[in-house]
C-alpha cells in the first residue's frame, strides 16, 4: 500500500506514530517469545538426545534377554506364550500448555500392565525379565513421543513467531514510518507555505498602513 493514499492530516500523523510505537512494542514481545521458545527447544532437544540413547540401550538389553529366552524355550513356545496373553496395555492422552503452545501428552496406564500375564505357567526367567523390561521401555518410548511432539509444536510456533517478526521488519514498520514521513513532509510544507503567506500579508498590511499615514 502506498503511503500517499493516506490523507496528510495531523490526526493521521498522530495515529501513525502511535501505531509505530505499538508495533515496536509488539516486536519486542515477539523477540522475547522467540528467545524463550529457543530456550525450551534446546532443553527438549538435550533431554530427547539423552533419553533416546537410554531407550536405545534399554531396547538392546531387552532384545538380548529375549533372545536368550527364545534359545531356552524355543521360538514356538515363546509364540504360544505371547498368543495366550490378551492385549491389555492402554495409554492416556492429555494436553499441556507451554508458553502458549499446546503440547499433546501420552502416558502409559500402569494399571493396564498385567502383573502375572503367564499365570501359573513356568517360563524362562529371561522371558519374564524381557517382558518386564519392555514394559519399562514402553514408558520411556512414550516419553520420547511426547518430547517429539513438544519439539515439533515449539518449532512450529517458533517459525510463526519469526514470520511475524519478519513481516513487521519488512512490511508493517516500513509502511508506517514511510507514511508518517510523507505526512510530516506535507504538513511541514504547508506550515512553510502558510508562514510565507502570512509574512506576505503582513508586509502588504504594513505597506498599506504606511500609505495611509502618508496620505494624511
From Swiss-Prot:
Any GO BP annotation: proton motive force-driven plasma membrane ATP synthesis
Keyword Membrane belongs to the record: yes
PTM comment text: The N-terminus is blocked.
Family: Belongs to the V-ATPase D subunit family.
Alphabetized InterPro entries for the sequence: V_ATPase_D
GO cellular component labels: plasma membrane
Protein name, UniProt field: A-type ATP synthase subunit D
Keyword Oxidoreductase: no
Keywords: ATP synthesis, Cell membrane, Hydrogen ion transport, Ion transport, Membrane, Transport
Subcellular location: Cell membrane
Subunit structure, interactors included: Has multiple subunits with at least A(3), B(3), C, D, E, F, H, I and proteolipid K(x).
Function of the protein: Component of the A-type ATP synthase that produces ATP from ADP in the presence of a proton gradient across the membrane.
One Pfam family in the UniProt entry: ATP-synt_D
HAMAP family named in the record: ATP_synth_D_arch
